[in-house]
Amino acid sequence: MKVLISPFAQTLRNGKENPKNFPYWGELVHKLLDRGIDVIQIGNIKDSCINFGSIMPHDHIGEFQFKQNLKFKEIANLLKECDTWISVDSFLQHLNQCLVRKRGIVIFSQSDPRIFGYSTNNNLLKDKAHLRDKQFWLWEQTEYNKDAFVTVDVVYKAVLKELKIE
């Protein structure tokens, strides 16, 4: 099994953490790799590899790859090759909807999946109470809130369900 991840939303101009960025990628990817699921992280040239903490990705059953600065066609091909994909509310879900239309998992925090998501995906939102009031304002005007995200276990269970693994 292979999962594509796009962990980061666009870098903010003010240098602050984008409120869309899920804070628990390292833990989630550890769980997937431990389960024998291969993970491919994609990002732009400015993105860094997710933080694995003290355990390196090669200490697992599954394999981890990090690919940067890919062309749209290359990303579309990866979407086709992977069994599912996971992203924050960012570019990947929109590219997928336009070019591939493969069901995936989108992690929302303060943006509303009823506005920015697609019903064909599994849109994960912890609580509507965390949605920002002005959905169309710039993200620089929104503070990062780690508590606005679903837990690692919620995402992990969603992945296993998509992969039909129990």
Regions found by a protein language model. Give the residues of each.
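Conserved donor-binding/catalytic core segment of Leloir-type glycosyltransferases
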Residues: M1-G15
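Hydrophobic beta-strand residues in large extracellular and virion-surface proteins
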Residues: V3-I5, L32, V39-I42, I105-I107, ...
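Short, flexible/disordered intra-domain loops and linkers
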Residues: T11-N21, N51-F52, W137-N145
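Flexible, glycine-rich phosphate/dinucleotide-binding loops
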Residues: L12, S48, P113-R114
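Short, surface-exposed alpha-helical recognition segments that flank or form part
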Residues: K16, L70, K146-V150
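Donor-binding and catalytic core of enzymes assembling or modifying cell-surface/extracellular glycoconjugates
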Residues: K20-Q110
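Gly/Pro- and small hydrophobic-enriched strand-loop and loop-to-helix capping segments
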Residues: L99-A129
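Leloir-type glycosyltransferase catalytic cores
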Residues: S119-E166
